[in-house]
Amino acid sequence: MSKLKGLLLTEGMHGMISQVEGLAKALGIDYIHQKVEINLLAKLLPPKITPISNLFFKKFTVPEIDLVISCGRKSVIPSLYLKKNSTKKIVNIHIQDPKVSLSNFDYVIVPEHDGLNGKNIISSKGALHYLTLKEIEKNHEYLSDKIDKNKQQILLILGGPNKYYKYDKKNMSRIFENIKGLAEKNNLQIIIIPSMRTPADTIDYANKFFGSENLVIQNVDKKAYLSGLSIAKFLVVTCDSTSMISEAALTGKPIYVAQIPSKRDDHRFRQFRDLFSKLNLSLIHI
């Protein structure tokens, strides 16, 4: 029997790609990934009042598919359009709260801390992701020639600014000082890994702040990320990324959450971290 064929729709961010590909791999389907690009008007309109039309996103070639897995606000309208206009019955699955009627999708997968309920809702404890321990260990040696073999490593994984958290120099300086203090106290080498959302000036600042005795990865590098997860004894993830905290939890290592003062009520992020703590996943706030 041939495998089902799926189309994955995201905005191209690491966390979203990780979630749709993680689900696709778990379902055992063949899939291709399509980055969604919406026009200016669609960026201004919330999905619930945006017409289901291909006038609101950049057209792309649609292969023969059995299901669509989408994640993020920008992928909602393309997913609904494909389901509505398909010549065959396709299943559409959306990850995260789509902010439209849930009945538009066959299934909606959301983290438990979002508090959404419905007959087609599937709740997850954290964010879905595509990582496996086998893949992490496979990339162990990628950074091995760049680290100090006489020290253990602590990994700092940087997310990026959003409407809740600001990545200004004041906030980054406090995080960097805390990490540097931990490293010096315990004779650790620091590895810093950025993500797609990490501002360039934050990476530049990290490079200057931590110096040559530590390792700052300058660009988004999946192999470096996986290698760092494998090599490091301690993991630190900025509080803005539920996806990367969920991925780090796979390792079973102690996870430190680098706190950033919130600009607005961040109760969903706090509920997520509280849930992980209740699951004994060793979240330590710094």
Which residue stretches match the model-derived regions?
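Conserved small/polar residues in nucleotide/adenosyl-binding loops
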Residues: 284-286
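Glycosyltransferases and closely related glycan-assembly transferases
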Residues: 20, 28, 77-91
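Catalytic donor nucleotide-activated moiety binding site of glycosyltransferases and closely related
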Residues: 187-222
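A nucleotide-sugar donor-handling region in carbohydrate enzymes
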Residues: 102-168
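A donor-sugar binding/catalytic signature common to diverse glycosyltransferases
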Residues: 11-13, 225-268
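N-terminal pre-catalytic "stem/leader" segment of glycosyltransferase-like enzymes
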Residues: 1-56
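Alpha-helical membrane-targeting segments
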Residues: 37-64, 81-85, 268-274
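Conserved catalytic-core segment of nucleotide-activated headgroup transferases in glycan assembly
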Residues: 161-193
